[in-house]
Every structure is written in structure tokens, then in C-alpha cells.
């Protein structure tokens, strides 16, 4: 991202930014503490960055606590349908909680902490002391989570790796950070994270350290966990999928392509009646969470 401080601002721009800063602080207070501004008087906007990559081209706001210098971030993005449904499905079906706000066409997302995927593969993966088996296991589970709920484009720039020291080993959790390809593409391969070339190093780890039976075991574990989460949040999930079914998420040609691919993959006619991406997503969840995992 490029920083707004990299160029000398004009006096007019300075006045606009000064006027904008308290509003940005208020948004942070709404996102994090429910809008109680009395608890946000010591917060300030330290920096505004502009994302020059990706479809969302977000603004990243850095909020700093004047008492202790601690900083946090949030993002301002365009609230398109795929991204909103992706956030909801991530919150409901994954082990991760998501915090965001929507107002009209504006989406406010909290920062998801972790090492960017490309940085993790470049700087952490070559470390001989790292537990490659645990990494391979987590990437299998991550890929399965994305595929089951049809979240696509999980290239290395679109996820982070959360590294947590445990009492004996280190735990790894892979988390998506961009959800604009939720149930959007017509090519089924886009939803299979391990097929992207920049994920090849971790896919090689999977093939090196996990046999087919173990891969199926980890995928079945993820199926069970997602099924349990879906049951706990059944009302919310039903509401999201109902709205998704009424929304034009993707072009018609994408719908037809994905529908044909799913029919071919599972040999099931249940997908043929689906007229929206929302219906395809709901049917895929229903079908797969009650099926023995198919081989990769």
C-alpha cells in the first residue's frame, strides 16, 4: 500500500484530512467498542494508506492510542455482494470470527492479523525448524473450508497465516483476507486453493508429508467441524443463503459454468435446478457435508 504521507499535501488537502480524522476515529469506535466516543478520545488517526492492488482497492486506516502508542487498523472497501456474503459465511462456517460494518456501498472491515501468505512461503517455509507436517495439515483444512463454501482466488496475497506458540509446538491457522470471489467465478478450479501456482510450495509439503488416507482424514475432520458450526448457526446461515439466493452475485455465464462443473464432479442432479449462485452454494454445502470426501 502507498501512504498518504509520501507526497507533500496541499493546504486544502490538509484541511480536508483534519476534518476527516475525527470521523474515522468514530468509525473505529463503532467497530470496536460500540460507538462509545468517551472511550475513544485518546485515539487518533496516524496514517491513511491506499491499496493499489486487488479488486477492492481499499483504504487502510491506522488508529493509534496516544497513551501507549499501540496501533490498530481497519479497512474501507466497496461493499459488493460477493464480499458481504463471503464475510458472513466465513463468520458462520469457519473457526474465525469476523467483525465488520456496512453503510450503503461502504464496507468497514477490521484488520485480520497474520503473516501474508507470500511472505510466509518466502521467509518462514524454508526454515528447517518449522513443523512442515502441521503446516501441511492446516493448508489441507484451509483448502477444504474454502472449497466447501465456494470461496475462490485464494492466492498467497489473499490470505494470512496466524502463528500461535503452543505449550509444545507452534499452531498455524490460515485465514482469508479477501472475500470478493465468494461464489463468483464459473471455473471450479478457482475454488481449489492448492491448484494456484504460488501455493505450489505448500502443496508440495502436503504431498511430501501426508499420504492420501491422512489427507482424507483431515478433510473429513473439517467437514464435521463445518457441519457442527452450520447447525449451531442454522438460523443465521439460512437467512444468509436465502438472501444470497435472491441476489445476482455473478454473471449468468459464471453460474452456468459452475453448475455444469459441480454436476460433473459429483454426478448429482441436485445442482441442475439451481438458478443462482446462492442456490449453488447452499446445495454444495448440503451435498458435501453429508458425503464422504471425494479424492483431490
Can you annotate each of these PLM segments?
Residues 119-126:
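AlphaC helix of the protein kinase catalytic domain
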Residues 92-94, 105-110, 142, 204-213:
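Short C-terminal domain-edge/linker segments immediately following a structured domain
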Residues 8-118:
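Conserved ATP-binding subdomain of kinase catalytic cores across diverse folds
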Residues 168-296:
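C-terminal catalytic region of ATP-dependent kinase domains
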Amino acid at each position: 500500500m502507498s501512504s498518504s504521507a509520501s507526497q507533500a499535501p496541499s493546504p486544502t488537502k490538509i484541511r480536508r484530512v483534519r476534518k476527516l480524522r475525527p470521523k474515522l476515529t468514530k468509525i473505529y469506535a463503532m467497530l470496536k467498542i460500540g460507538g462509545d466516543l468517551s472511550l475513544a478520545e485518546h485515539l487518533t488517526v496516524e496514517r491513511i494508506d491506499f491499496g493499489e492492488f486487488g479488486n477492492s482497492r481499499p483504504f487502510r486506516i491506522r488508529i493509534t492510542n496516544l497513551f501507549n502508542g499501540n496501533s490498530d487498523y481497519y479497512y474501507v472497501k466497496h461493499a459488493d455482494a460477493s464480499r458481504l456474503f463471503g464475510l458472513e459465511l466465513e463468520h458462520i462456517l469457519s473457526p474465525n470470527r469476523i467483525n465488520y460494518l456496512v453503510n450503503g456501498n461502504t464496507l468497514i472491515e477490521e484488520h485480520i492479523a497474520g503473516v501474508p501468505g507470500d511472505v510466509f512461503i518466502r521467509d518462514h517455509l524454508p526454515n528447517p525448524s518449522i513443523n512442515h507436517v502441521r503446516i501441511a495439515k492446516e493448508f489441507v483444512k484451509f483448502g477444504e473450508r474454502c472449497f466447501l463454501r465456494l470461496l475462490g482466488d485464494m492466492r498467497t496475497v489473499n490470505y494470512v497465516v496466524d502463528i500461535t506458540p503452543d505449550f509444545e509446538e507452534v499452531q498455524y491457522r490460515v485465514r482469508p483476507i479477501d472475500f470478493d470471489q465468494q461464489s463468483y467465478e464459473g471455473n471450479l478450479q478457482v475454488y481449489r486453493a492448492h491448484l494456484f501456482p504460488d501455493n505450489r510450495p505448500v502443496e508440495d509439503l502436503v504431498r511430501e508429508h501426508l499420504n492420501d488416507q491422512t489427507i482424507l482424514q483431515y478433510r473429513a475432520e473439517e467437514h464435521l467441524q463445518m457441519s457442527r458450526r452450520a447447525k449451531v448457526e442454522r438460523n443465521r446461515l439460512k437467512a444468509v443463503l436465502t438472501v444470497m439466493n435472491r441476489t445476482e452475485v455473478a454473471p449468468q455465464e459464471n453460474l452456468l459454468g459452475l453448475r455444469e462443473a459441480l454436476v460433473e464432479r459429483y454426478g448429482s442432479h441436485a445442482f441442475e435446478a439451481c438458478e443462482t449462485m446462492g442456490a449453488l452454494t447452499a446445495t454444495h454445502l448440503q451435498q458435501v457435508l453429508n458425503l464422504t470426501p471425494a479424492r483431490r
